[in-house]
C-alpha cells in the first residue's frame, strides 16, 4: 500500500519536480540528452527579488563619497594556483587567502576563489552590463568575511554582505601575457571535476587592470549568480575592463566542456540579467571618474556652446 501511494505521489508531481535537480545554463538545455534545471527553474533563493547580475544604468547611479580606495593584502604574491573545471566554469582556488578591506566595506574579507563567465561572442559573455552593453567575459574574485570579524556567526550567516565579490569586465584587445598561465592550464582540465596546477606563478594583481583604475567602481547589494543564489553579496563592479586577445578569450569555449563526453562546449555560462527593483547602484567618489565616452566626444557640446557665445 505504501509503495502504491509513493508511486501516485511521484506521478502527480510536476515535471520540474521529477527532473534532475542539477542546475545548468540555457545553452545546456538544447542538447536533447541533457536534463537539468534551466535559469528560470533554478531553486533556492533564485526567484527572489534581490538577485544578480543587473544592468547598471550609469546615469542613475548615485555618488557615494564613502566608496574610497581598497586596501589589498596578498594580491601581489605570485602563486602557482590550482585550477579546476567544476562543470559550470573554470575556478582558481586561492589557497593563500589574499584579502581586501576599505572600499566602503564593513570589515576585511578573505579571497577564496576566482572564476569567469564567457561566450564565443565578444559582446555576450559578461553577466553584468553597463547601459545595456555586455562584454566578452566577466571575472569574479569571491571573498568571505574573515572569521572572528563578523560578530555572532549564527546571526551573521544571513547578513546581506557576508560575501564580497570583485567583478571585472573583460574585453577583446591585445594579448595579456599575465593571463597566459591560466589559459594554458585549460588544456589539462577539459572535463568536469578535473584539476591542474598553473605551470607559472601568477599574482592577483597580474590579472587586474592597473591599480590606479581600481578607484573607479559601482556598488550594490545582490546575490550569487549561481544556485542557490543566496542574497548575501556586496558587489563591486569595476569600470575599467581587463583586456585579453580574442584567441585567449575563445580558448575558454574551445578547451572546456560541460560534460564528461566532451560533446557540449562550456560557453555562454551566463545568468540572464535580473531586475534591479528598488535597489540603488552607487558609484565610487574617487576624483577623476573614468569617462564612459572619449574626451573629445564629451567636450564637443561644450565647445559648440562657447563658440556660439563668442560669435554673439
Swiss-Prot record:
Binding locations of substrate: 225-226
Annotated glycan sites: 33, 152, 195, 265
Residues forming the catalytic site: 88
Membrane topology: Lipid-anchor; GPI-anchor
Cellular compartments annotated: Cell membrane
Disulfide topology: 24-36, 46-229
One GO CC annotation: plasma membrane
Cofactors named for this entry: Zn(2+)
Main location as per UniProt: membrane
Residues where Zn(2+) binds: 115, 117, 140
Signal peptide: 1-18
GO molecular function: carbonate dehydratase activity; zinc ion binding
Lipid-substituted positions (GPI-anchor amidated serine): 284
Primary enzyme class: lyase
Keyword annotations of the record: Cell membrane, Disulfide bond, Glycoprotein, GPI-anchor, Lipoprotein, Lyase, Membrane, Metal-binding, Signal, Zinc
Subunit (UniProt): Interacts with SLC4A4.
Name of this chain's protein: Carbonic anhydrase 4
Organism annotation: Bos taurus
Top-level taxonomy: Eukaryota, Metazoa, Chordata, Craniata, Vertebrata
Amino acid at each position: 500500500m505504501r509503495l502504491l501511494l509513493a508511486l501516485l505521489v511521484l506521478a502527480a508531481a510536476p515535471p520540474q519536480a521529477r527532473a534532475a535537480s542539477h542546475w545548468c545554463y540555457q545553452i545546456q538545455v538544447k542538447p536533447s540528452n541533457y536534463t537539468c534545471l534551466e535559469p528560470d527553474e533554478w531553486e533556492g533563493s533564485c526567484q527572489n527579488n534581490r538577485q544578480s547580475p543587473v544592468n547598471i544604468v550609469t546615469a542613475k547611479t548615485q555618488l557615494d563619497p564613502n566608496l574610497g580606495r581598497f586596501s589589498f593584502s596578498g594580491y601581489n604574491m605570485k602563486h602557482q594556483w590550482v585550477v579546476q573545471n567544476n562543470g559550470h566554469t573554470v575556478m582558481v582556488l586561492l589557497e593563500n587567502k589574499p584579502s581586501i578591506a576599505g572600499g566602503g566595506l564593513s570589515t576585511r574579507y578573505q579571497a577564496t576563489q576566482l572564476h569567469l563567465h564567457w561566450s564565443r561572442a565578444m559582446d555576450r559573455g559578461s553577466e553584468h552590463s553597463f547601459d545595456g552593453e555586455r562584454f566578452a567575459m566577466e571575472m569574479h574574485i569571491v571573498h568571505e568575511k574573515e572569521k572572528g570579524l563578523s560578530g555572532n556567526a549564527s546571526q551573521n550567516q544571513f547578513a546581506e554582505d557576508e560575501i564580497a565579490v570583485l567583478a571585472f569586465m573583460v574585453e577583446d584587445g591585445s594579448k595579456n601575457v599575465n593571463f597566459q598561465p591560466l589559459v594554458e592550464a585549460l588544456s589539462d582540465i577539459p572535463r568536469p571535476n578535473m584539476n591542474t596546477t598553473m605551470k607559472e606563478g601568477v599574482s592577483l594583481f597580474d590579472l587586474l587592470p592597473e591599480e590606479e583604475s581600481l578607484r573607479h567602481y559601482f556598488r550594490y547589494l545582490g546575490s550569487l549568480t549561481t544556485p542557490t543564489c543566496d542574497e548575501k553579496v556586496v558587489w563591486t563592479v569595476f569600470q575599467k575592463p581587463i583586456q585579453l586577445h580574442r584567441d585567449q578569450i575563445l580558448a575558454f569555449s574551445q578547451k572546456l566542456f560541460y560534460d564528461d563526453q566532451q560533446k557540449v562546449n562550456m560557453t555562454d555560462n551566463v545568468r540572464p540579467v535580473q531586475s534591479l527593483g528598488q535597489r540603488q547602484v552607487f558609484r565610487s567618489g574617487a576624483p577623476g571618474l573614468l569617462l564612459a565616452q572619449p574626451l573629445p566626444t564629451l567636450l564637443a557640446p561644450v565647445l559648440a556652446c562657447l563658440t556660439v557665445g563668442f560669435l554673439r
